């Protein structure tokens, strides 16, 4: 069977002028991930990453930690949704800077509004548009893995949660799918690995959010 490993990017720079840059911890998480995968004899036939700086930097750190020379392909289908746009579109979002705890509270309320699908015109990318492109990206990566290859995908928590929710309950209605996504999205660890196996009956979720290479201060969610 083919294998697709979905990797969340390392810790980005929350609260800085440019979130889309790995922190020092994020770089270390990427290197630790690469070393851990190499120790387990993972040898990817292809590395795919989203088209964001944090995806590129995580891929660079992972490749360095693993000592891989795999080809890297960019697929914007694995990009994160515009989380700041979603938060900013919520009418009750406070003005001014928010600390991590307050931002998380506002983020969860704002994403619930977004996933409800009742205000699609308020967002540059609607919830159906986001989930549709992620499912298409997952299909591409599974096809690239083929019957016996290994594709490592560097993405973000939102797309990984969307792909995982779709695989866990393919027949879920829109509301149930959104609820499952919300639960999964809040717990995806930086540089964690979610494993998808690809067989004759299609892709199946094998594991979600593996992170044994992390401990102490290297274990982060934001």
Predicted segments, located by residue:
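Phosphate-handling substructures
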Residues: 65-135
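Acidic, low-complexity terminal tails and accessory targeting/binding regions
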Residues: 68, 81-101, 147-150, 165-222
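Generic beta-sheet signal
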Residues: 4, 149-155
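Conserved histidine-centered catalytic loops in small-molecule metabolism enzymes
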Residues: 44-77, 102-115, 195-222
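Active-site metal-binding loops of divalent metal-dependent hydrolases
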Residues: 10, 157, 209-210
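Short beta-strand scaffold positions
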Residues: 49-50, 132, 154-155
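Active-site-proximal alpha-helix that buttresses catalytic centers in soluble enzyme cores
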Residues: 2-74, 128, 222
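Glycine-rich phosphate-binding loop signature in dinucleotide/nucleotide-binding domains
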Residues: 40-43, 141-149
